[in-house]
């Protein structure tokens, strides 16, 4: 139910100064659907923080296939790309900077759109200006939540992770290969300060009850233990 989902998201709320949300990507799965899934999760997470009284900024850093503006029914004419193209200024009152175009989309929740699409966003994401922008934005908000492209599809997520304090890695139940999870978590840990944890999405209460059964756990461990 919707209330149960909100309780789950609320349990993730903590005292972090910065977060990046990384949706899982499976090579056999269409990258576009992975981006849509991750977008819903990220917007729900940011909304949960805002409802807990945190001044929250949600940034759409998926510069190839931006989705956040659609979730909030906004235009995508200003944002990271337009800011970068107009000199990448990091001084002054950034929430009021017209080249950034930060929009208030809810009580305590603001949105920084991508500002269009880019076929080669690496120049922006690995720039000192982008790192300085994230650092400065933390002065205006209690929490900054970043939506990134699916991990594994492109290198953008790893570039973003290097600029953040914490990473939450999202895997969809029955869609993630164990070897891929280990590979990507290792890559994240080598490129950022901290991997806060892994969130398993799509696991119903019925499945949770089944997997918590001791007999199943023993057979699960026996089967997968040999793959460790």
What is each model feature region?
Residues 1-228:
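P-loop NTP-binding module
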């Amino acid at each position: 139910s919707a209330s149960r989902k909100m309780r789950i998201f609320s349990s993730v709320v903590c005292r972090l100064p910065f977060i990046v949300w990384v949706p899982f990507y499976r090579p056999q799965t269409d990258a576009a659907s992975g981006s849509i899934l991750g977008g819903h999760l990220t917007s729900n997470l940011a909304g949960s923080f805002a409802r807990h009284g945190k001044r929250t900024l949600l940034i759409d850093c998926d510069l190839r296939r931006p989705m956040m503006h659609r979730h909030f029914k906004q235009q995508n004419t200003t944002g990271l790309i337009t800011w970068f193209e107009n000199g990448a200024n990091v001084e002054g009152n950034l929430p009021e900077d017209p080249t950034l175009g930060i929009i208030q989309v809810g009580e305590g929740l603001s949105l920084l759109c991508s500002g269009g699409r880019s076929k080669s966003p690496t120049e922006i994401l690995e720039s000192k200006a982008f790192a300085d922008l994230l650092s400065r934005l933390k002065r205006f908000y209690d929490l900054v939540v970043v939506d990134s492209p699916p991990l594994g599809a492109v290198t953008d997520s790893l570039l973003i992770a290097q600029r953040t304090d914490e990473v939450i890695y999202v895997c969809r139940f029955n869609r993630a290969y164990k070897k891929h999870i280990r590979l990507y978590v290792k890559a994240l840990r080598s490129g950022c300060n901290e991997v806060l944890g892994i969130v398993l999405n799509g696991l119903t209460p019925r499945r949770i009850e089944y997997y918590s059964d001791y007999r199943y756990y023993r057979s699960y461990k026996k089967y997968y233990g040999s793959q460790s």
